[in-house]
């Protein structure tokens, strides 16, 4: 038998089968840097319609984790998909650079500011440290293949940005949304500073649970509130608390106006007593206190008890009964001990009754010297002493432990307290900010849609935002206030601008260096500088003003999109919304997209302590960034995002399918010159015309999916196209034609033209997701092209089939269904040992008239569609159990038999004319025509 390999057009390409991504990707990054690709993209798309995704700044501290990677990859997929869709989509990454975690790090290195080191030097070290962290994180983000202006990012520590943050504060102040108040705020005793709601996270904490009695100050007066009071023994009201440390600050008890209270006779240690408790809570209170025998000896409502007084359990302090809407019957006694220093509701109800705070704690959570019994003790450690004192005074009725959800600092992970201090607030209601924000929320597109309900609920319940911090490393609240009244200077707008100009030159140190006399003149003796700094959520929250509107390449408000993790409804989305509405009266974003957290296969949050964490660096070093990017695209980001080693392996398999399909296409067009070999669309063979139409249709679907941020659909459709329509059908069918026909024949060039169109489109479809691989593929596609795929838009060489085409979409859909049924029958026959490969067989198709029409339309080329050596069509009435088997396709039976003919040594088909030609005894007539003659002709497949 002769070797005919040299007569075949076999696929050939230098495009590697193995991705070898961990080695190739860094080389690609270097090339992108060398050619200044990001800058070239900006130049190429200059003047087109803009799409602005505004980057929520990660905190400049520590290595990036998987959550960071997910966030940046999602942003990059969107920015690149908008670019390929023809938008000018610049991406300016940012970093949040002020605040407590950086202060803590620097404190461990050089000591506390004002103690071991001067404030200016401390701020210099903080700046230095933050910039080091930015450099580290930037390297990892770039390694992910994320495009952006990485070496001109926005940093909240940039002098210009710091100045613009101060300007934004000035605008909010002059628009009347700012107020100074003495209110309880979340306070970190570890950090010695106030915290905003967004900096609070809730974790389980085990606390002391105690019931305490407050004796009546005037029993006779108190009992007059009960119309039918009887019984004997001392009268007291019972409170329940899980924060014994707040009792030194207890100034009142609160009751519900409409709640029914019971005067209850009981006996404790043989002594008769009468307790006042909400009647509905009586059973649970008595059970907690170990009292079995009791009876109600009087009833009244909370309203009846208003103004009655009790005595503090261990101080000589009169405790009035107040009415408060916050009192519920969910737990406790229906009576709430009220400490205005340590709770918003407590503060509000005391404020209504004219009861002032007493400020018993210092910044570090230590009781001041004037606090009787507990001076010098720390809130974290004082509970046992408080309980001991209550026991000694006979006021402790029960003591247990309770595990409950408790506020913790999201940075230091330590429990928070409420502490009343003078602070600066953005008022939610003074100028109607809450209502305006709620109205703006409705105009924004929220992805997923439940995000709208979530942020609406948060804004509805949001307290005034405490924006002041008692820290060293932060943007100053650059105001002058009157020494006596604490009112803002009447010329605040001008003064803020003067300060901002100085900060623009030398940074936030300018505020501390400014001489008040230089700005205020004679007024300086009556005014003082505010020494507080801004909440870091204010820094990032005003980047719509300090960055979006300031950067020339962005230059628009609102942004098209904000994209962050789902925790940012209470964080950056909310702080940005409040400040934008306060300054501009508008939301800072048109769309908001949120993604879920990363979890392991069991749904557990990833953490080092659990040992289930997967670091992005580990994935990139082992599998490559493109595998991580593909996992992000293939995962539903609207819920928790599950990742494990098994999932990564499956993702790598999917990647190989896309890569191998691309490689096969490249191998098939290796000698193709699109300038001279391209076949006109109308001249393509029917099957080739169909695959181009299918690619056109898919491209339209992918454009829509990208536009809707439905990357799972993009992944599924592309993967399905590669594995089913290309891999299992089209590329399988055309092998014979492409390999065996004359290279310059219409049949061969038509197949190459179609594949050229497909790879040109496919490479663009995957570029936003598989960025490294797409760029690699791009460099192997024949023909002149731009130096990067990322300078291109969606491929315009695809065309849909004309409506009503004889062999249109419906025709090929019907044929594919028949082919699937034939393949199944062939597989069953092969498994049963009746036949070998499909080319050793001939098939008989017994079909309905309509189906016969479809099948006969392909004439002699029908066998190529089934990859069999013969295919005959008969009426379904000619079928029998002996000559065919039923199929899933209604009206179709298939007969399969081994061919009796010899095998062609070149095309491997079994044909009756093999050996009929003397010059080539082992070839079929078709192959001889393709070698020695003018070549076979095909019309369809």
From Swiss-Prot:
L-isoleucyl-5'-AMP binds at residue 564. ATP binds at residue 608. It holds the Pfam family Anticodon_1. Binds 1 zinc ion per subunit. GO terms for cellular component: cytosol. A motif ('HIGH' region) lies at residues 58-68. Keywords: Aminoacyl-tRNA synthetase, ATP-binding, Cytoplasm, Ligase, Metal-binding, Nucleotide-binding, Protein biosynthesis, Zinc. It is found in: Cytoplasm. Its cofactor is Zn(2+). InterPro entries: aa-tRNA-synth_I_CS, aa-tRNA-synth_Ia, Anticodon_Ile_BEm, Ile-tRNA-ligase, Ile-tRNA-ligase_type1, Ile-tRNA_ligase, M/V/L/I-tRNA-synth_anticd-bd, Rossmann-like_a/b/a_fold. Its EC number is 6.1.1.5. Gene3D superfamilies: 1.10.730.20, HUPs (3.40.50.620). Belongs to the class-I aminoacyl-tRNA synthetase family. IleS type 1 subfamily. NCBIfam families: ileS. Monomer. HAMAP family: Ile_tRNA_synth_type1 (MF_02002). This is Isoleucine--tRNA ligase. It comes from Hahella chejuensis (strain KCTC 2396).
């Amino acid at each position: 038998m002769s070797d005919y390999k040299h007569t075949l057009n076999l696929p050939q390409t230098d495009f590697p089968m193995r991705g070898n991504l961990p080695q190739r990707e860094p080389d690609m990054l270097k090339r992108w840097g060398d050619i200044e690709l990001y800058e070239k993209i900006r130049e190429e798309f200059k003047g087109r319609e803009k799409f602005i995704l505004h980057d929520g700044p990660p905190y400049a501290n520590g290595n990036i984790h998987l959550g960071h990677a997910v966030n940046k990859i999602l942003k990059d997929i969107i920015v690149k998909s908008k670019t390929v869709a023809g938008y000018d989509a610049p991406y300016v990454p940012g970093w949040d650079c002020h605040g407590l975690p950086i202060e803590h790090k620097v404190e461990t290195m050089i000591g506390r500011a004002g103690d071991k080191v001067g404030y200016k030097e401390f701020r210099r070290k903080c700046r230095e440290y933050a910039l080091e962290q930015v450099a580290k994180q930037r390297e990892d983000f770039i390694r992910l293949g994320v495009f952006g202006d990485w070496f001109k990012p926005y940093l909240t520590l940039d002098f210009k940005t710091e100045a613009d943050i101060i300007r934004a504060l000035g605008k909010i102040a002059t628009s009347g949304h700012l107020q100074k108040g003495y209110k309880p705020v979340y306070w970190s005793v570890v950090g010695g500073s106030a915290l905003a709601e967004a900096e609070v996270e809730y974790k389980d904490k085990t606390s002391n649970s105690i019931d305490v009695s407050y004796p009546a100050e005037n029993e006779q007066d108190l009992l007059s509130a009960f119309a039918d009071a009887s019984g004997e023994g001392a009268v007291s009201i019972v409170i329940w608390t899980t924060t014994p440390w707040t009792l030194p600050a207890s100034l009142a008890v609160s009751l519900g106006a409409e709640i029914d209270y019971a005067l209850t006779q009981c006996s404790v240690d043989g002594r008769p007593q009468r307790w006042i408790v909400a009647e509905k809570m009586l059973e649970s209170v008595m059970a907690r206190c170990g009292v079995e025998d009791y009876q109600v000896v009087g009833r009244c409502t909370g309203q009846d008890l208003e103004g009655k007084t009790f005595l503090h359990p261990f101080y000589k302090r009169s405790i009035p009964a107040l009415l408060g809407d916050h009192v519920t019957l969910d737990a406790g006694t229906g009576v709430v001990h009220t400490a205005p220093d340590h709770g918003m509701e407590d503060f509000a109800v005391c404020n209504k009754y004219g009861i002032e705070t007493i400020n018993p704690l210092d910044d570090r959570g230590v009781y001041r010297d004037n606090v009787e019994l507990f001076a010098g003790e720390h809130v974290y450690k004082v509970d046992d002493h408080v309980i001991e004192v209550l026991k000694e005074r006979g006021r402790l009725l029960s003591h247990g432990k309770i595990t409950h959800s408790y506020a913790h600092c999201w940075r230091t992970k330590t429990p928070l307290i409420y502490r009343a201090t003078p602070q600066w607030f953005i008022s939610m209601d003074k100028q109607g900010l809450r209502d305006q924000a709620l109205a703006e929320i409705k105009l924004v597109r929220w992805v997923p849609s439940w995000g709208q309900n979530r942020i609406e609920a948060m804004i509805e319940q949001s307290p005034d935002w405490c924006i002041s911090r008692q820290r060293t490393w932060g943007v100053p609240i650059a105001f002058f206030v009157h020494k006596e009244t604490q009112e803002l200077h009447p010329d605040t707008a001008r003064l803020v601008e003067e300060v901002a100009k100085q900060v623009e030159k030398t940074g936030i140190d300018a505020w501390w260096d400014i001489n008040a006399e230089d700005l205020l003149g004679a007024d300086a003796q009556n005014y003082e500088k505010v020494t507080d700094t801004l909440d870091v959520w204010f820094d990032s929250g005003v980047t719509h003003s300090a960055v979006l509107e300031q950067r020339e390449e962005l230059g628009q408000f609102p942004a098209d999109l904000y994209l962050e993790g789902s925790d940012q409804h209470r964080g950056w989305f909310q702080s940005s919304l409040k400040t934008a509405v306060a300054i501009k009266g508008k939301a800072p974003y048109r769309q908001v997209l949120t993604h879920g957290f990363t979890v392991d296969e069991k749904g557990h949050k990833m953490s080092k302590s659990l040992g289930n964490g997967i670091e992005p660096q580990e994935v990139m070093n082992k599998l490559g960034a493109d595998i991580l990017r593909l996992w992000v695209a293939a995962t539903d980001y609207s819920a928790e995002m599950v990742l494990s080693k098994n999932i990564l392996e499956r993702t790598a398999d999917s990647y190989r399918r896309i890569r191998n399909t691309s490689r096969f296409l490249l191998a098939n067009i290796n000698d193709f010159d699109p300038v001279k070999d391209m076949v006109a669309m109308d001249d393509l063979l029917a099957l080739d015309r169909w695959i181009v139409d299918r690619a056109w249709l898919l491209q339209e679907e992918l454009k829509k999916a990208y536009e809707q941020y439905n990357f799972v659909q993009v992944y599924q459709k592309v993967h399905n196209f590669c594995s089913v329509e290309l891999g299992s059908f089209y590329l399988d069918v055309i092998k014979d034609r492409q390999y065996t026909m004359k290279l310059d024949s219409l049949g061969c060039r038509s197949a190459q033209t179609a594949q050229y169109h497909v790879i040109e489109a496919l490479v663009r479809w995957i570029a936003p997701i598989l960025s490294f691989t797409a760029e690699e593929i791009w460099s192997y596609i024949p023909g002149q092209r731009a130096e990067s795929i990322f300078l291109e838009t969606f491929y315009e060489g695809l065309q849909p089939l004309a409506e009503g085409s004889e062999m249109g979409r419906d025709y090929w859909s019907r044929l594919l269904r028949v082919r699937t049924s034939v393949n199944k029958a062939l597989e069953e026959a092969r498994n049963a040992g009746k036949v070998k490969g499909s080319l050793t067989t001939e098939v008989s198709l017994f079909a309905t008239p309509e189906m016969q029409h479809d099948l006969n339309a392909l004439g002699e080329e029908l066998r190529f569609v089934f990859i069999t050596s013969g295919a005959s069509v008969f009426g379904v009435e000619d079928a029998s159990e002996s000559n065919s088997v039923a199929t899933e396709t209604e009206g179709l039976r298939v007969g399969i038999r081994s061919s009796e003919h010899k095998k062609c040594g070149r095309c491997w088909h079994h044909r009756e004319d093999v050996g009929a030609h003397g010059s080539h005894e082992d070839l079929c007539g078709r192959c001889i025509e393709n070698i020695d003659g003018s070549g076979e002709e095909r019309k369809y497949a």
